[in-house]
Amino acid sequence: MTREEFATLVGSRPVILDGATGTNLQKAGMPVGVCPEQWILENPGVLIELQERYVEAGTDILFAPTFTASRIKLEEYGLENSLVQMNYELVALSKRAAGGRAYVAGDLTMTGRQLYPLGDLMFEDLVEVYKEQAKVICEAGADLFVVETMMSLQECRAAVIAIREVCDLPIMVSLTYNEDGRTLYGTDPATAVIVLQSLGADAVGLNCSTGPEAMIDPVQQMAEYATIPLLAKPNAGMPELCDGVTVYRTTPEEFASVGAKLVEAGVAIIGGCCGTTPEHICALKQAVGSMPVHMPLTKKRRMLASERMHVEIRLDGKFMVIGERINPTGKKKLQAELKEGSLSMVRTMATEQEENGAQILDINMGMNGIDEKQMMLDAIYEVTSTVDLPLCIDSSHVDIIEAALRIYPGRALVNSISLEKEKIEYLLPIAKKYGAMFILLPLSDEGLPKDSAEKHGIIREILRRAEAIGMGKEDIVVDGLVATIGANPKAALECFETFSFCKNEMELPTVCGLSNISFGLPERSYVNTAFLTMAIGNGLTMAIANPSQELLMNAAFASDMLLNKEESDIRYIGRMNYLSEKHEGMEHVWVPVGTAKGAAVKGTAAGQAGNAGGAKDSGNANEARSAVFTAVLKGNKNHILDEVKHALDAGETPDDIINGHLIPAINEVGELFDKQKYFLPQLISSANTMKVAIEYLEPMLARSDKEPKATLVVATVEGDIHDIGKNLVVLMLKNYGYHVIDLGKDVPADLIVDTAMKENARVIGLSALMTTTMMRMKDVVELVKERGCTAKVVIGGAAITESFAEEIGADGYSKDAAECVKLVDRLLEKE
């Protein structure tokens, strides 16, 4: 199937996907804990019968059962050397079941490993894992691909890049969302569709997670930005335990009724996930088969995105600032740090610029004496772990920009592409491949344009070249090419003409490097501010500038208000209130309209975020305390030891630091996580930062006879090989002073209970991601009672609920790692 054929199919009517595979195979006798792919190959008739029933029910696309047949997943069962044969045979089984009446999609999913910097799996290694599997699936004859049940946008990117480097088959991508409407890593539905459609996905949507009703709102969010079809594959409700069996209550008729609402909301491709059967798909086909298809947007919006937020660049929208400070040019202290391999100042600059109102951050690592490419990658990892803002990748080297775009977990802005041969022939296709926007720099191999007519010609030619490879005006921002007024008295007037031409004739947004205009002049801030105000009036959309310059920023806010831009009066008043409080010494962080939810944090520690960048010269203990607190709050793992040592030098004891600063900081992180202002990356980053501090202080605590609070045994239950959530629980509990015995994943009930009794553990913590392994938790609870083990049992996992915990007799349930600590504290306080 070609991508064009896929688009034609989806544009003609709602396309029906199949329903659940795993839950139906389990009903047919597949045991818990086996490798599903191997069991299918040993029992091929079961899969063929199920998928034939789906085809009879009206399915247009079957998912081949290659879901966990990647090298990383197969290694869990010692089957990695069977990868090629297994994927070939699994695709063949589905093609046999389809019988030419349905298409077959090769199915990829998450690996269960954490990507760097949260884990040890490098992005390029993950791309290779997906490429290996995708190549086999493509050669086996799959018609298209689906990347499904994804929790991480970055893993989605790796899979799409891998498939695109192997073949040009259609790609559908589907993520899972929590009740709060975000993925586990904090990505909202709109951001996901913006990033993935720009990267080359042919359809984007969501699956699993919830029942169909809860998917309507996320679908509507996606539909506002989607230029490709949307898909939905909901569960048949949430799983419940009935007489020891996991059941899904949503009937085929109920499922089909809400399925019709999903199609009305914008879904063009629809099927079922956990708990659905051929009967659900048959009812769905009857309900939606003749409904009109919601057509995606024909005109793209100018969108940039990080992993957790998106911003829109509008011709008549609010003026935007690209923070310029992360650039070593002229910054001797930053240059010295970069030569030492430190990115502490980069973190601080990112945080300060976000808090001062920048909407995008420019990253430039151009200097002698360092590996610029590696430093660019390290800076991107550091900044994306610190702030939510989208990035502008700034380098004069094509290979550095390509490396940065490849690993950036969002949709970036490239700074810049000119008509120079290297840029237009090599960098432009790279920007297209990775779905980036770019700054159009009106230069050619002949140098600066001689006049406006030549500049206009270069702009038109670069636009033509971009359109020839599938890009458009929505992917471009034009640089006004600001010259120094000291050398060219008409420099400002020429820029104003360019801004006006781009906005009014070309319908293109514009940007400029603001400070160039005043180079060599005294009191440059006045010149810069006057130029900015006049430039905005002539159509300038954004500027690369220092957002900490209050005069400049205030002029931008005032200019927007005078031009009567939407909500400009509210933004101006908010800005003035923020400055008033700031100048009165109040600790306050301003979050301007349109920035990321939770991008900045109000409070004592957050108000001093800039202090986390380096150790203090002062011996003041209060200052040291705030720095320790803030380092944990901001996840500054590379500098926490400097702050802890400074606190010790200032007179703090190890106990003071842990109980007075580290634990309060991680408590605040947990509260921010509960409020959905922090997400999994920030939680892990802060927890790892605290771990560094605890490990440093532990020997000192041992000398003072400090004992652990209690012993706990934690494990992922038998048959379940997922451990991301469990690992985070272990990390958090250790940070709070508990002695944790981590038994790992796929752990039998006997070993869990035996270990708890041998170690005199007071709590057993159980994790399960899959609905098929939930019942193993009940086995542990029953064995605890049978053997007279006194440990409390607490449980958690994606499909686990409070009612399930009560039904199996567990002592408690927590939805996440932060809540688990509170639960354990409460249980032990009662004893």
Predicted regions and their residues:
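Domain-level signal for soluble alpha/beta catalytic cores
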Residues: 1-479, 483-831
